[in-house]
Amino acid sequence: MNPKNSEINEKSTGYLKDYAEEYEIFLNEYPDFMTTSAIDELRKSDYPNLDRQNHIYLDYTGAGLFSISQIRKHHELLASNIFGNPHSSNPTSLAMTKLVERTRKAVLDFFKADPEEYDCIFTCNASGSLKLVGESYPFTTNSHYLLTYDNHNSVNGIREFTRAKGAKINYISVLSPQLHLDQNELNCQLEQAIPGANNLFAFPAQSNFSGVQHSLDWVDIAKSKGWDVLLDVAAFVPTNKLDLSLVKPDYVCLSFYKMFGYPTGVGLLIAKKEALKKLHRPWFAGGTITVASVKGDKYYLHQGAEGFEDGTLNYLSLPAIEIGLNHINSVGYEVIHQRVMILTDWLLKKLSNIHHSNGSKLIQIYGPDTIESRGGTIAL
C-alpha cells in the first residue's frame, strides 16, 4: 500500500486506516483466519508472480490461478513421454488412452461419483457441457423445462432447444433483497411435471451473479416429483466440495480452469449412466461412432462417454486435470472455503458500513448480506 495514497484516502473518506492497525483488528475479529496460514506459505512458493507484480487476485469464480507446481508437473510429464492420438492403437496412443482413463477415474473419485452409476465426459468448457445436454435432451410438447432467474446464460440458452421442440418453459423467481429462490413458487412448479414425460429442472449450486448458494436438497425433491436435474456447479466447486455420493443430480456441468486455473479449454459433464441413455445426439462426429456408411444413413454411436466426445479430445491437457485436483486436495477444501468466507464476511460488513454524509447507505448489495447460504461472489 502506498502511504501517500493511504493518507489522501483517509483524509477524504475517513475509511482507510493504518494497515497494521486494521490487520490486528481483523485478526481479533476473525481468529480462525490464522488456521488458513498455509495458503500464505503456498502463495510464496507456488504463486510468486502475485508479489513480483504487486497483484491482489480475488477471483474465485471466473478463473482460478494456476500454481507453478502444476505447470512444472504437467510439463515434466509431457517432456519425458511420447503421446499419440488416443483414437489410434499404436504404443504412443495406447499410453495416452491409459492417461485419459486414469484422468476420468481421478475426476469421479474427486467428486465421489460411483463409476457404476456415473460417466465422465470431457468437453471444451462448462457451456459446451450444457449445450450437449440441451441439444440431446428428448424434449417433446409434453415436456417442461424449469430453470431459475439466476442461472448462467448458457443454461438460459437451453430454452432455445426446448422452444424448438414445443416444450413448456418456466422460470422460478428470486426474492429481493437476499435473492434466494421463491420456494413456494418452486414447489408449485415442481408439481406440474407430467408423469412419464421428459421434464428437466436446471439450477446453479451457486449463483454466478449474486453468490447465493441454493439448497442441494432440491435435487432429490425435484427427482421425487418426476424431474431430471441439471446442476451447474461451475461457480460452486472452486471453493466448495461436491459429494456425488450424497447429492445425485442427473447431469453436472463445470469448467476445470475455474477450479485451479489450468488447463483452460477443458470442461466436464458428469452424467448418470441411465440419464445418458436418455440423450439423443442430433448428429455424429469423428470419435463418437463405431460405424458410419456413405452408402446409407445408418451409423452407430459408441456407448457411454465416447459417444458424446466429438472429435479428438484436448488429450495433452487432460493429465493436467489430475494434477490440479491433487493440488486442491493438498491445500484442502476446508482451508480454501474458510479463507474465502472469512474475507467475504469482512468485506460484506465493510461495504455495509459505508454511508453518505446524510447517513444513508452508499452501497446496495444484491444477495445475502451475511455469509449464510452464500459463496464469495458479491454483487453491488
Segments (PLM) and residue ranges:
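Pyridoxal 5′-phosphate
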Residues: 2-380
